[in-house]
Amino acid sequence: MDTHAREYPVTFTDAEWRQRLTPEQYQVMRQHGTERPGTCALLHEKRQGTFSCVGCGQPLFTNGRKFESGTGWPSFDEPLEGAVETTTDRSYGMVRTEVHCSRCGSHLGHVFPDGPPPSHNRYCINGVAMDFTPA
């Protein structure tokens, strides 16, 4: 994955990423893929806790910011401060805002301006890119 110009605090070689991640996690997080909607075990997670990056362990979102968007992917209205960064994604003939981990640069999903108030953001995140730790 070389679409991000900066170096991240956590880096691994491609071989190390392949060893650390499952094939599906690698495809989503390192090759900018998308998991099938409705297939994520974290989609219906309602316990209080924290969602973290599978690639590096950085906390990304809390369950207090999660909401049901009806899209089939875990959705949040705000990330933890400094946890994610965004870039413009021009793939598939669309212009979207990609969300990636600010610590390791792994692709997480996209953010859209159609979420609930007050932020009106919908961070649509691939569940395979996250771990959940109950509070």
Summary of predicted features, one role per range:
Residues H4, Y8-A135:
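A short Gly-Trp-Pro
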